[in-house]
Swiss-Prot record:
Compartments, as annotated in UniProt: Cytoplasm
One Gene Ontology term from the biological process aspect of the record: regulation of cell shape
Superkingdom of the source species: Bacteria
Pathway named in the protein's UniProt entry: Cell wall biogenesis; peptidoglycan biosynthesis
Binding site for ATP: 131-186
UniProt name for this protein: D-alanine--D-alanine ligase
GO molecular function: ATP binding; D-alanine-D-alanine ligase activity; metal ion binding
Length: 306
């Protein structure tokens, strides 16, 4: 596609979610890449200016670099569709489903995709029954947050209440999830094609917000070092997990590989990070796709699915 055919592009960044800081980093990295490629691209932060200004300012399409609520949950996608403005990533329904880990897990279970067992929690939950079912340790997290915000690993039953309260500060839907010990992996999908798997090794604790975006000790291996047969099997399952939610364009599917070689899928991200610590650019690089090329490919897909 000719660069001129992309028209005037708004890079949506920042936003109102708890992931605003990361979205600003992703958005500015995307903006710089587009401008290096001679795309007429401009930053647009929905905080402080209404989305309808996109039409008033003559934008032709949007690159969504928003993360979390109001940007990755179908809200912005719906507004852009009402304005008939093409955008990157998945549509309204797939975005909303992927943002909701509870409904994602229900769909994956119905489709035969392995995901850790779970229990939905509320203020009246019997935590003893939860630990009897899921065992310890377990994970407690908000159903509709990203970047592991509000997530805690619970090693002892007496810590269940405080972990629940932390998660409930971020969302009315809270999940207690079976903890799977194993290798943390992520599978990036670009234009319905799985990219090389990324293996994540955290030296201490969980792969949480700090480890994802700020730690210099988190180790990433791409390609993952797994056998070709196992890699292909995981990539195929990740692509199926992406498709069954209705995702289009690009996404990132996170999983744990247990000691028996069984992948357990955790979540799908329809607007993955694009910072210097981010995993999709890392996977693309291993596939021979530079960051600038990746950004252009994602943007071009907004034309295909428009």
């Amino acid at each position: 596609m000719n660069i001129r055919d992309l028209g005037k592009v708004a890079v949506l960044l920042g936003g109102r979610s708890a992931e605003r800081e990361i979205s600003l980093k992703s958005g500015h990295a995307v903006l710089a890449a587009l401008q290096r490629s001679q795309v007429d691209a401009h930053a647009f932060d929905p905080v402080g200016q209404p989305l309808e200004d996109l039409l008033k300012q003559g934008f032709d399409r949007a690159f969504i670099a928003l993360h979390g609520r109001y940007g990755e949950d179908g809200s912005v996608q719906g507004a852009l569709e009402l304005m008939d403005l093409p955008y990157t990533g998945s549509g309204i329904l797939a975005s909303a489903l992927a943002m909701d880990k509870w409904r994602t897990k229900m769909i994956w279970q119905a489709a035969g995709i392995s995901t850790p067992d779970y229990v939905m929690l509320d203020a009246d939950s019997n935590f003893q029954e939860v630990t009897d079912r899921l065992g310890l340790p377990l994970i407690i997290k908000p159903a509709r947050e990203g970047s592991t915000i509000g997530l805690n690993k619970v090693d002892y039953a007496q810590d269940m209440q405080s972990a629940y309260q932390t998660a409930a500060q971020h969302d009315s839907l809270v999940i207690a999830e079976q903890f799977i010990q194993g290798i943390e992996l992520t599978a990036a999908i670009l234009d319905d094609v799985p990219l090389p798997l990324v293996r994540i090794d955290v030296t201490e604790g969980l792969y949480d917000y700090q480890a994802k975006y700020f730690s210099e000790s988190t180790r990433y291996t791409c390609p993952s070092g797994l056998s070709k047969i196992l890699t292909t099997r995981i990539q195929e399952q990740a692509l199926y997990a992406h498709r069954i939610l209705g995702c289009t364009g690009w996404s990132r599917v996170d999983l744990i590989l247990d000691k028996n070689g069984q992948p357990f899928f955790l979540e799908a991200n329809t607007s993955p990070g694009m910072t210097n610590h981010s995993l999709v650019p890392m996977a693309a690089q291993a596939a021979g796709i530079s960051f600038d090329e990746l950004v252009i490919q994602i943007l071009e897909l907004s034309c295909e699915y428009a």
